[in-house]
UniProtKB/Swiss-Prot annotation:
The lineage of its organism: Eukaryota, Amoebozoa, Evosea, Eumycetozoa, Dictyostelia. GO terms for cellular component: dynactin complex; macropinosome; phagocytic cup; plasma membrane. Member of the pointed-end complex of the dynactin shoulder complex. Keywords: Cytoplasm, Cytoskeleton. Residues 179-198 are annotated as: Disordered. The keyword Cytoplasm applies. The keyword Cytoplasm applies. It holds the Pfam family DCTN5. It is found in: Cytoplasm, Cytoskeleton. This is Dynactin subunit 5. It comes from Dictyostelium discoideum (Social amoeba). Residues 179-188 have a biased composition (Polar residues). Residues 189-198 have a biased composition (Low complexity).
Length: 198
């Protein structure tokens, strides 16, 4: 699947050795507890609360603008306990979401402005429609489509959704490119060699 290139200012992103692209205007709290497994995109305004518990985000996953990734919590003997949060491979999270799920499987699509409440479990290959609010402790089965406020089951999804999501997130990653003179419609000029004298 091919998507239109989307260009970003290279100076505004950090690119790691394993291909993660992290916006400098995102906030990664407790960075030692945050693991990005490669070719993951963290866009501007994203907040990842690794200071509360460990957060693992799989390969070729995309966290869109102004989304909050926050580990689940539960009161235990009068105090709030936070649990590690796992997000699988090929997951696309839309803009303006709050994600407090205990776990999200692979090949999952979450639309814009969704709230995935505490301790929710999203299995592989599911879709959460825009503006959906999943109540706490919701379990979304694989190959299902949920929407609404509160979010409820709407229909089953075909088996091909797995391959579609893999191809879609891969294309989004590959088309997320740093700005160049050519991408801005400017003529490219050869770089002049600079020499120094000692």
């Amino acid at each position: 699947m091919q998507v239109q290139p989307k260009y970003f200012e290279k100076s505004q992103y950090i690119e790691t050795l394993n291909g993660n692209k992290v916006s400098k205007s995102s906030i990664l709290c407790g960075i030692m507890n945050i693991r990005l497994h490669g070719k993951t995109i963290i866009k501007p305004g994203v907040i990842v609360r690794g200071d509360l518990a460990s957060v693992n985000i799989g390969r070729l996953s995309i966290i869109s603008e102004n989304t909050v990734i926050r580990p689940s919590s539960k009161k235990f003997k009068g105090s709030l306990v936070y649990f590690p949060q796992n997000i699988g491979d090929h997951v696309l999270v839309g803009e303006g979401c709050v994600i407090s799920a205990a776990s999200i499987g692979s090949n999952v699509y979450i639309g814009n402005n969704c709230i995935i409440s505490k301790r929710c479990i999203l299995k592989d290959c599911c879709i959460i429609a825009d503006n959906t609010i999943l109540p706490p402790d919701t379990v979304v089965p694989p190959f299902t489509y949920y929407s609404g406020t509160p979010g409820v089951y709407k229909e089953d999804l075909p088996d091909c959704i797995e391959q579609f999501q893999k191809e879609y997130t891969t294309s989004l990653y590959e088309s997320f490119l740093p700005n160049t003179p050519a991408s801005k419609g400017l003529p490219s000029t050869p770089t002049k060699l600079q020499t120094t004298t000692t």
